[in-house]
Amino acid sequence: MAMTLIVLAATMGNKYGGLKQLEGIGPNGETILDFSVYDAVRVGFDKIVFVISRHFEQEFKKLVSGKYEHVVDVEYVYQDVETIPEEKRNPKRTALYGSVRAVLMGEELIDAPFGVINAVNFYQRESFELLYNNLVALKDAGYHSFNVCYRLKNVLAESGGVTRGICEVDENGYLISVTDRTGVERISSK
């Protein structure tokens, strides 16, 4: 059974002003995406589906394809406003339709449990281990999905507001609800 990781990489960071997912940050120019793919492959993922935009397809593939295709199966799907059926499309909308729509772009390539990450977020290896191990256990566990969550204080930007899904869980750790909050920011205790 292939263990697939869907990487959401179609958005261009408006606040950042460019393709944050392709910006080198490591000592040898590694991107956040490089660290994620490395950790995902090390824990057992053997297929990566990148959800990208046709607007930067060539640049993305040039920087990504050669790095990963020799160690993991790589496929691409596209998320653009044009992928919405015309009768359901808002003609005034230029922004992408969100993470769920992005994941649906890859549905024809998925035939087993899969994980989803954002290309611009840093996930520690332990997160990939938790994700992978729970995906392997899904069939026998009696549930169909799960969420790897983080404490809010650990996922806030140093400055400025962000949008976060706030998860409510019960005493057993089961998800009760997710509420989208915008403008969430760190407040100094000084």
Q: Where does each model-flagged region fall?
A:
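N-terminal glycine-rich phosphate-binding loop and ensuing alpha1 helix
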Residues: 2-65, 72-74, 79, 91
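Structural beta-sheet core signal
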Residues: 5-7, 50, 116, 145-148
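A short, conserved beta-strand element in the Rossmann-like catalytic core
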Residues: 13, 122-124
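Residue-level signal for inorganic ion chemistry
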Residues: 33, 106, 151
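Short, electropositive alpha-helical surface patch
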Residues: 59-71, 128-137
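Short phosphate-binding loop-to-helix
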Residues: 68-113
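Short beta-strand-to-loop acidic/aromatic patch adjacent to the donor-nucleotide binding site
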Residues: 112-122
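Conserved core of the sugar-phosphate nucleotidyltransferase
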Residues: 125-190
